[in-house]
Amino acid sequence: MYRTILVPVDISEEELTSKAVRCALDIARETGAKLHILHVLPISSAIINAYALGYMEIKDKATVKAEKELSMLVDSIDLPNDRISYSISFGSPRDEITSTADEIEADLIVIGSRRPNITTHLLGSNSAGIVRYAKTSVLVVR
């Protein structure tokens, strides 16, 4: 049924990441799908303005840290190496996730979400944005 499952994760949110990965892994095992784990490092205009001169250094350090943590996560997933991949990108989580889903031709996105609170109702959440803008099916795991 599914060939490629995209699992966007926030490696700093261990509980959400774990729930989404477990769910996606169950689906991948049942369907023979490949998993692609994606971590998006958001770029806030405040960070860019505050550190404009050292932006590349900050970006490089964040990438190295994320690469290490994401690699450890992928290594812990019990799936053959040819069925799991990962990537890191910079930008708006919603835009990067929907763009990556298109690029890898994902037929399912599995994303973790917290229970909504007043902030997410007023401002929206990454999960809500992905559900709204993705061209493929999205499974939100709570």
What are these regions (language model features)?
Residues R3-Y51:
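Small/aliphatic-rich secondary-structure junction motif
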Residues V9, G112-R114, R142:
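Short secondary-structure boundary segments
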Residues H36-L38, S85-S89, L139:
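General small-molecule cofactor/ligand-binding pocket signal
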Residues V40-K68:
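Acidic, proline/glycine-rich short linear motifs
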Residues L53-M56, I104-E105, S127-G129:
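Short, hinge-like loop/turn segments at secondary-structure boundaries
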Residues D75-I109, P116:
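Structural beta-alpha unit
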Residues I111-Y133:
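Glycine-rich, Arg-bearing micro-motifs that act as flexible, cationic patches
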